A protein has these predicted regions:
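Short hydrophobic/alpha-helical segments at membrane-entry points of transmembrane helices
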Residues: 27, 112-118
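Residue-level signature of mid-helix packing/kink "hotspots" within the transmembrane helices
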Residues: 40, 68-76, 159-160
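Conserved MFS/SLC helix-loop-helix module at the cytosolic interface between two early adjacent transmembrane helices
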Residues: 73-112
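Flexible cytoplasmic inter-helical loops of multi-pass small-molecule transporters
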Residues: 2, 6, 194-214
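Extracytoplasmic
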Residues: 24-57, 75
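A generic transmembrane-helix signature of 12-TM secondary carrier transporters
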Residues: 95, 99-102, 117-118, 183-190
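Cytoplasmic helix-loop-helix junction between adjacent transmembrane helices
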Residues: 118-155
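Helix-loop-helix hairpin linking two adjacent transmembrane segments in secondary transporters
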Residues: 142, 150-201
Length: 214
């Protein structure tokens, strides 16, 4: 009887572990899919947007510099955030920042608002660039090469597809629709990340074994 109960408990634990890893896998890949989309969905539309909102080539140049600047800032602040809040909660916050920035900028009618909210989205994505590799190491240490390949493949898809579809969508439905279409990806990433954070509660700060360091 004791052996049977032990076997059943082991099977339940193994099944829960598999479900947990599948949830983390979905969370990582969905976030990876949008780590470049705020840039590549916007860049092809800047000239069209500038005609409606009213900014010139100098501002378009500023938009071009934002990814480098915000990714650099993210690289500086992320180690402190993960040290304080843990990898999972920091990643969830990054997803939320990406969603808010990408969604809210579609309603902007001012250059300043578009710039600020793009910065917020880019900061979230920059944090994602930093935290995903250690998350892969934490949850898939036995399959780092495979997971890294999957992550890079999805990242490339998220870089290429928005750039290819931005102008056709904008021509058909307007630039705001074209931008908001790609908000659906980080929104989809929210649910699994909320689940990961809940499952990790009580452990996310104590375990720093795979966290990024400055």
């Amino acid at each position: 009887m004791t052996a049977t109960l032990r076997d059943e408990t082991h099977m339940i634990s193994a099944a829960a572990l598999r479900r947990g890893r599948l949830m983390v896998l979905a969370a990582i890949l969905l976030f990876a899919l949008c780590l470049r989309s705020a840039v590549t969905s916007l860049s092809p539309l800047l000239t069209q947007i500038s005609h409606e909102i009213g900014f010139g080539s100098a501002v378009i140049g500023v938009f071009g510099m934002l990814p480098t600047a915000m990714f650099a800032i993210a690289g500086l602040v992320t180690p402190a955030l993960t040290e304080r809040f843990g990898l999972e909660r920091t990643t969830l916050a990054a997803v939320v920042a990406t969603v808010i920035g990408m969604a809210a900028r579609t309603a902007m009618n001012s250059t300043g608002g578009l710039l600020v909210l793009s910065c917020l989205a880019l900061l979230g994505m920059g944090i994602g660039n930093v935290v995903i590799p250690p998350l892969v190491k934490r949850y898939f240490s036995h399959r780092v090469a495979l997971m890294s390949a999957a992550y890079l493949t999805v990242l490339q898809i998220g870089t290429t597809v928005p750039a290819l579809t931005a102008v056709p969508l904008a021509d058909a439905y307007g630039w705001r629709f074209s931008l908001v279409a790609w908000v659906l990806v980080p929104v989809a990433a929210l649910l699994p990340w909320i689940g990961v954070v809940i499952a990790r509660r009580g452990h996310d700060v104590e375990d720093h074994s795979a966290e990024p360091h400055a």
